[in-house]
Amino acid sequence: MNNLKWVAYFLKSRMNWIFWILFLNLLMLGISLIDYDFPIDSLFYIVSLNLSLTMIFLILTYFKEVKLYKHFDKDKEIEEIKHKDLAETPFQRHTVDYLYRQISAHKEKVVEQQLQLNMHEQTITEFVHDIKTPVTAMKLLIDQEKNQERKQALLYEWSRINSMLDTQLYITRLESQRKDMYFDYVSLKRMVIDEIQLTRHISQVKGIGFDVDFKVDDYVYTDTKWCRMIIRQILSNALKYSENFNIEIGTELNDQHVSLYIKDYGRGISKKDMPRIFERGFTSTANRNETTSSGMGLYLVNSVKDQLGIHLQVTSTVGKGTTVRLIFPLQNEIVERMSEVTNLSF
């Protein structure tokens, strides 16, 4: 904020003083006009001296009182303002003390709530890890099932449980995702194939195959774990809303950027739903009776893609299917973005 604005604010806040002083001086001038015995020259001298002293007083008061608010305008911490004793007047000191008490109390609440959130996150993480043990044991038991039809049905349900546990684990780690990322060149094809293998029990039951076509060098600079999570959620949606149609997966190269597309021929997304597909908990308005969707998959994808520098495009036609395209960044773009984030944090 420039000095002229500060002067305007100060004068506006002292306008009652200024009007009162002007009123008193005009009153004296008025009295002198009525009382002819009162020397007019002496009165003009007194009024001029009074106004001059008032002007000096206002200037000194301005520099004394505005100093604190200039520190506020620079976003100084209240602790620094209190520690350096930047408040000049008793009212300013009272205001600073009040703000300090309130902000300190709020900070204590935030710290307490953060500790509770951390404990909650740790509890859920431990729960997911603990429950993974019997789920893994369940898989070994299912593999021993002789009846192939029953085995396939059990593997389908097991895959859904395992996928939901992984999704819950990623949700709890969202807040700490930046600390949990490690960027390196990884094979996009390898990640896609690994995720297809994890979903094979679901795809087999639903009669869905995969047409994979990698035409370009598929090594991308990303974090393996979080990138696989994005691919998994998109594949999960494609499988969930498709039936007896193959899912097409491939890569393209545009402006040196590798892009991965996943195309299904399912029911598609309506135009009115499209702006809301990334909202937490949002499910299709066209199928309100559906209970298998949690509305968390694309929310997770949207929450992570920016940290990975991935540009996401979704196109869909109702009754014809959906295409999701992931455009991966170059290494220098990731390094530049991370440098900007680091500078902002300081």
Curated annotation (Swiss-Prot):
Q: How does it sit in the membrane?
A: Multi-pass membrane protein
Task: Kindly indicate whether the keyword Membrane belongs to this entry.
Answer: yes
Q: Which UniProt keywords apply?
A: Antibiotic resistance, ATP-binding, Cell membrane, Kinase, Membrane, Nucleotide-binding, Transferase, Transmembrane, Transmembrane helix, Two-component regulatory system, Virulence
Gene3D superfamilies, per the entry: Histidine kinase-like ATPase, C-terminal domain (3.30.565.10)
Stretches of the chain forming a coiled coil according to its record: none
Task: Extract the Pfam families matched here.
Answer: HATPase_c
Any one GO CC term of the record: plasma membrane
Q: What molecular function terms (GO) are annotated for this protein?
A: ATP binding; phosphoprotein phosphatase activity; phosphorelay sensor kinase activity
Per the UniProt entry, the signal peptide is none
Which purpose does this protein serve, as stated in its record?
Member of the two-component regulatory system GraR/GraS involved in resistance against cationic antimicrobial peptides (CAMPs). Functions as a sensor protein kinase which phosphorylates GraR through the auxiliary protein GraX. In turn, GraR up-regulates many genes such as adhesins, exoproteins, transporters, toxins, and proteins involved in cell wall synthesis. Down-regulates the expression of many genes involved in RNA and amino acid synthesis or glycolysis.
Q: What is this protein called?
A: Sensor protein kinase GraS
Originating species: Staphylococcus aureus (strain JH9)
